[in-house]
UniProtKB/Swiss-Prot annotation:
Binding residues annotated for Ca(2+), in chain numbering: Y27, G29, G31, D48
Cofactor: record remark: Binds 1 Ca(2+) ion.
EC category name: hydrolase
Name used for this protein in its record: Basic phospholipase A2 myotoxin-I
Amino acid sequence: SLWEFGQMILKETGKLPFPYYGAYGCYCGWGGRRGPKDATDRCCYVHDCKQICECDKAAAVCFRERKYMAYLRVLCKK
């Protein structure tokens, strides 16, 4: 579930999922489009698996292993 995915992200990164990753880059969160803007955004792009447990875990680990750069969706061009 989305809640469980959020718990995985919190456990792996120590960051709250929605404020940190819900609108990160051009691909994380709802309605991801275009290509990823950095390594963290690429985690969302590669692991866009719609709540499949193993894939969600891989995404959470991917977030942990990448530097968080605060690349907000508002910076993406249409």
